[in-house]
Amino acid sequence: MSEWMKKSPLEWEDYVYKEVRVIACEKEYKGWLLTTDPVSANIVLVNFLEDGRLSVTGIMGHSVQTVETISEGDHRVREKLMHVFASGDCKGYSPEDLEEKRTSLKKWLEKNHIPVTEQGDAQRTLCVAGVLTIDPPYAPENCSSSNEIILSRIQDLIQGHLSASQ
């Protein structure tokens, strides 16, 4: 078993967002370590290309022999890496925005005679009729239910609510 595989996920975390050199099965890789899989020890490396594009490389954990840090990077690199897989339309919400969206949606559902409760430690998840949940940021794609009919209807209602409130 390689030195890399013997490390714990907490030790692997020390390499995240750093530029590293990985030796794996007689091949050498260089790049910014984005993440490691805690079960398989697989590594995801990112390289920023000159034309602005990205190169993403996955390295199987069992093939990794050594990993060494080349440079620490700065906050700009870390920011870029943190948003590598975020969709272009992904935007952050402040806690106040989320509270406002949750309250607005809950009131609207209650106004339309749909039974809704809050659940979870922070009461952030809305639960509709005990069979559907809506997580922040309370959009149609944040609904989950095993009942496809209810899921579809509630998603349509939420979409209508969002369209009307804009």
From Swiss-Prot:
PROSITE patterns xref list: AD, SM
Subunit text: Part of the core SMN complex that contains SMN1, GEMIN2/SIP1, DDX20/GEMIN3, GEMIN4, GEMIN5, GEMIN6, GEMIN7, GEMIN8 and STRAP/UNRIP. Part of the SMN-Sm complex that contains SMN1, GEMIN2/SIP1, DDX20/GEMIN3, GEMIN4, GEMIN5, GEMIN6, GEMIN7, GEMIN8, STRAP/UNRIP and the Sm proteins SNRPB, SNRPD1, SNRPD2, SNRPD3, SNRPE, SNRPF and SNRPG. Interacts with GEMIN7; the interaction is direct. Interacts with GEMIN8; the interaction is direct. Interacts with SNRPB, SNRPD2, SNRPD3 and SNRPE; the interaction is direct.
Pfam families, alphabetized: Gemin6 (PF06372), Gemin6_C (PF20417)
Keyword field contains Kinase: no
GO process annotations (BP): spliceosomal complex assembly; spliceosomal snRNP assembly
GO cellular component: cytosol; Gemini of Cajal bodies; nuclear body; SMN complex; SMN-Sm protein complex
Domain called AD: residue spans: 68-166
Residues covered by the Sm domain: 4-73
Protein name: Gem-associated protein 6
Compartments reported by the entry: Nucleus, Nucleoplasm; Nucleus, Gem; Cytoplasm
Organism (species): Mus musculus (Mouse)
Upper classification of the organism: Eukaryota, Metazoa, Chordata, Craniata, Vertebrata
Record has Phosphoprotein as a keyword: yes
Signal peptide: none
Gene that specifies this protein: Gemin6
Protein function: The SMN complex catalyzes the assembly of small nuclear ribonucleoproteins (snRNPs), the building blocks of the spliceosome, and thereby plays an important role in the splicing of cellular pre-mRNAs. Most spliceosomal snRNPs contain a common set of Sm proteins SNRPB, SNRPD1, SNRPD2, SNRPD3, SNRPE, SNRPF and SNRPG that assemble in a heptameric protein ring on the Sm site of the small nuclear RNA to form the core snRNP (Sm core).
Coiled-coil boundaries: none
Phosphoserine: modified positions: S94, S165
UniProt keyword terms in alphabetical order: Cytoplasm, mRNA processing, mRNA splicing, Nucleus, Phosphoprotein
